[in-house]
Amino acid sequence: MGLDPLTGTLLILARPGDIDGDTGREAIAARLTAIAGVPVEVRTWSEMDANLAVEGGGRVVGSDAEEARRFVCTSGFVVTDGTLSALTTAAHCPDTLNFIDHDGTAIPLTLLGAWGAHRQDVQIHAVPMPLAAAFQSDVEDRARAVTSWRNRASTRVGDIVCHRGQRTGYSCALVRFVDFAPAGDLCAGPCPATWVAVDGPKCRGGDSGGPVFLGNVAFGLVKGDSTSRGTCALYYYMSIDYLPPGWTLSYTR
């Protein structure tokens, strides 16, 4: 569910199996319009909204105790508590992770905390080395410095943002919603309408936790996606201002 501020229309995303074709969609839209008092549009999107699966080749690698197979996510931004610098990724990634360097070296990370409920999907890891306030963006072998950030209240529908994922690389697209509520119990229960959704165009398992940015400005961390017929319809991210208390983005002044 999301609100289009350009038209004032409330957009409801329904799974195809939950409604009876075009007739059912129009009937539901009319009923909800009468209840809400604003225009409502019902669209069929994907059969499932999901946290991006942690799989495929990537930079942050780990496994859960219950499963033997390896999972892969994408590292996000460097954060600090005022004393320690640490690395972020998504909370739904494994707790035990290794950072994979350019030469293939596995660097063990130490979990400092994970926040995976409601409006948050982030975990923070200590790294046994100094960390620069930088991230991979369009060029894999050259880091980009972080110089500022954009919070959710300052993000607008139609803004351009970019993201980098270990499975899909670098891509940019328009913000579709700034108050998106993913379907299902992906937020340790129903998700609040605090997620920012972007029009793809690329998202796959393994992109979870990756940085969302524009130039040197940090926007957030990738949480999940909504796909249609195997195509990335949109992905959504946690805004950087929802980092846990005591932690802030590291940036170059």
Regions found by a protein language model. Give the residues of each.
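Short solvent-exposed strand/turn elements
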Residues: 93-96, 186-206
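Soluble, acidic/polar mature domains that operate outside membranes
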Residues: 35-53
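Serine endopeptidase catalytic core focused on the charge-relay Asp
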Residues: 66-184, 213-215, 223, 249
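Short amphipathic alpha-helices in soluble, non-transmembrane regions
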Residues: 23-36
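Short glycine/threonine-rich beta-strand-turn micro-motifs
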Residues: 1-25
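Catalytic nucleophile loop of clan PA
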Residues: 201-221
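A generic structural motif
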Residues: 10-13, 87-89, 121-127, 193-200
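Short, low-order "capping/linker" segments at domain edges
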Residues: 49-71
